[in-house]
Amino acid sequence: GEGRMLAYRIDEEVSLRMFDEGDAEEFYNLTIHSKEHLRKWLVWLDQIESLEDITQYIRTRLKIMAEDGGYLKSFAIIYKGKIAGTIGFNAFNKGNKSGVVGYWIGENFQGKGIMSRALKAVIDYGFKELGLNRIEVCVATENEKSRALPERFGFTEEGILRQAEWLYDHYVDHIVYGLLREEWE
């Protein structure tokens, strides 16, 4: 691979690819249908009011990619031809060769092992194609579903960031999980 990963087939059901503006409507519907289910943990989802908001979100992602030499940082997760969620590097530090992975999946797509497959592919991509040495996942301490993923892939629980995020009316602590390239290979 040349590190650009515009589309990546994981298996017969799941693939990752870049967003394009033509995805706006489908992606918007996914966020609307998943709002109740995800809003507890994703404040930005609650702020999406219109198709225009999603189009803007996609444009921003594409702009970040273009500015960064075409390396993809955020992916649409495709399950049987439909957008199921997103995964990608929310933060990226070239000097230290580290990246922070974030992800979410629509309510109807839960419990099919989709996110496990996607995360495994993104970890591979991060270490092999982007040349990262360290990958982090930060999860609210009470978000047990989300915590199960890094734990399954051998991430080390490295510490707690106290009151790391403001969720509507209260702060939540984040657990920082870390995985090093030498632990993955």
Question: Where are the regions a protein language model picked out?
Answer:
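Short loop/turn motifs at secondary-structure junctions and domain boundaries
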Residues: 65-70, 155
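Conserved GNAT-fold acetyl-CoA-binding loop/helix
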Residues: 39-60
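Acyl-donor (CoA/ACP) binding surface of acyl/acetyltransferases
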Residues: 1-26, 30-37, 74-185
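A short hydrophobic/aromatic micro-motif that marks alpha-helical segments and, especially, helix-coil
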Residues: 38, 49-50, 65, 184
